[in-house]
From Swiss-Prot:
Outcome, altering K413E: Decreased S-adenosyl-L-methionine binding and methyltransferase activity in absence of RAMAC. Decreased interaction with RAMAC
Organism, as annotated: Homo sapiens (Human)
One example GO MF annotation: RNA binding
Function: Catalytic subunit of the mRNA-capping methyltransferase RNMT:RAMAC complex that methylates the N7 position of the added guanosine to the 5'-cap structure of mRNAs. Binds RNA containing 5'-terminal GpppC.
Record protein name field: mRNA cap guanine-N(7) methyltransferase
Catalytic activity: a 5'-end (5'-triphosphoguanosine)-ribonucleoside in mRNA + S-adenosyl-L-methionine = a 5'-end (N(7)-methyl 5'-triphosphoguanosine)-ribonucleoside in mRNA + S-adenosyl-L-homocysteine
This protein's encoding gene: RNMT
Membrane spanning stretches: none
């Protein structure tokens, strides 16, 4: 409890220092005390020229206390955190042969994380930023990073349901998709309680339209889809047209589609109706691309929040910078991961608030540069657009909270977001590594449970547990 209280106070201090960074003309950075172990969580910022000495000293004392306690506080590693629910399992009839399973797998929508927004030179509210911590070569790569991200997603090939169902990360992608579905559904309901009709949504970084069905099920009236990748936007539009033209299709929202870099271009200049307001802006697995610079992050936030109606929400999913750096510092090299995902930084120990680049690779899905999103900084920057943070949870926390709801639990089954364990005699587990299911085997041995269990492999959980969900509300 003492460690938890200190961590909470520590987070508040991080927020104050992020605020100092936004208001000053000095680019700051955050780091982990060099004595931090794998289980430690002691993140800090380098003292900036505008920071008071006593705050920095107090923060250092915090770090020392957190590091000392981290080794004995029993903090779970990603592999130990995996929660098993014996009730969250597919029906027995769904555990037939592998080919049968592939044909039966009907998912709500394409569930590849849509990391489509990108980077560029923001022009709004520019400020001077000291770039001593950023190599000279990196300063000149803004356009290159933007082009790299757009090219990557433009070149991704569409694959059928059959092939996707055979993917090593089939359940991981379904699990991430379930997380988005629950988040979107919950905040659509909040909007509907305030506004009975005519709900308008901005999908910032829409990709190929993986969330279109979610918006349809949410009974919205208008959707604006925008993405940096032109090919992805065209595929998204085609998917929408296919949904609209189905004979048995119910009423579907109206939509417009925009190819633009949301960290470089002002979206209202491209809307059919520049005065249009939104009830929700959804930014799923995207906003980290904009944190190459302050200007880019600010432009992304302006696009996301400026046209939100009072009481509207900016919701999303993004990597948890604290978790990324914790794993990095626990690694013996500048990278970490497993056979599913890898994260590679340029160096340890120095993490600027903007432009802290790392390369992220997820098997067959993502292989592009990303940037750390220091969440206290995002929170502070959002205040400029009259936004208040109303919800933030790690994927683990979000799962544990939402799985208690029976509707969410049933949706988890329908979307096949957890893998049946043990596998049926006619099928096999997605991972061939025995230790990937040690947690499930142990749980099954020590508990009276109904089989099969529903779980993710250890490798998949390590990949998905680097993320968090968030929601900001537009104030009056």
């Amino acid at each position: 409890m003492a460690n938890s209280a200190k961590a909470e106070e520590y987070e508040k201090m991080s927020l104050e220092q992020a605020k100092a960074s936004v208001n000053s003309e000095t680019e700051s950075s955050f780091n982990i005390n060099e004595n931090t172990t794998a289980s430690g969580t002691g993140l800090s910022e380098k003292t900036s020229v505008c920071r008071q000495v006593d705050i920095a000293r107090k923060r250092k004392e915090f770090e020392d206390d957190l590091v000392k306690e981290s080794s004995s506080c029993g903090k779970d590693t990603p592999s130990k955190k995996r929660k098993l629910d014996p009730e969250i399992v597919p029906e027995e009839k769904d555990c037939g042969d592998a080919e049968g399973n592939s044909k039966k797998r009907k998912r709500e929508t394409e569930d590849v994380p849509k990391d489509k927004s990108s980077t560029g030179d923001g022009t709004q509210n520019k400020r001077k930023i000291a770039l001593e911590d950023v190599p000279e070569k990196q300063k000149n790569l803004e356009e290159g990073h933007s082009s790299t991200v757009a090219a990557h997603y433009n070149e991704l090939q569409e694959v059928g349901l059959e092939k996707r169902s055979q993917s090593r990360i089939f359940y991981l992608r379904n699990f991430n998709n379930w997380m988005k579905s629950v988040l979107i559904g919950e905040f659509l309901e909040k909007v509907r309680q305030k506004k009975k009709r005519d709900i308008t949504v901005l999908d910032l970084g829409c990709g190929k339209g993986g969330d279109l069905l979610k918006w349809k099920k949410g009974r919205i009236n208008k959707l604006v889809c925008t993405d940096i990748a032109d090919v992805s936007v065209k595929q998204c539009q085609q998917r929408y047209e296919d949904m609209k033209n189905r004979r048995d299709s119910e009423y579907i929202f109206s939509a417009e589609f925009i190819t633009a870099d949301s960290s470089k271009e002002l979206l209202i200049d491209k809307f059919r109706d520049p005065q249009m307001c939104f009830d929700i802006c959804s930014c799923q697995f995207v906003c980290h691309y904009s944190f190459e610079s302050y200007e880019q992050a600010d432009m992304m936030l302006r696009n996301a929040c400026e046209r939100l109606s009072p009481g509207g929400y900016f919701i999303g999913t993004t990597p948890n910078s604290f978790e990324l750096i914790r794993r990095l510092e626990a690694s013996e090299t500048e990278s970490f991961g497993n056979e599913i995902y890898t994260v590679k930084f340029q160096k340890k120990g120095d993490y600027p608030l903007f432009g802290c680049k790392y390369d992220f690779n997820l098997e067959g899905v993502v292989d592009v540069p990303e940037f750390l999103v220091y969440f206290p900084l995002l929170n502070e920057m959002a205040k400029k657009y009259n936004m208040k943070l109303v919800y933030k949870k790690t994927f683990l926390e979000f799962y544990e909270e939402k799985i208690k709801n029976n509707e969410n639990k049933m949706l988890l089954k329908r979307m096949q977001a957890l893998e049946p364990y043990p596998a049926n005699e006619s099928s096999k587990l997605v991972s061939e590594k025995v230790d990937d299911y040690e947690h499930a085997a142990k749980y099954m041995k020590n508990s009276q449970v109904r089989l099969p269990l529903g779980t993710l492999s250890k490798s998949e959980w390590e990949a998905t547990s680097i993320y968090l969900v968030f929601a900001f509300e537009k104030q009056q």
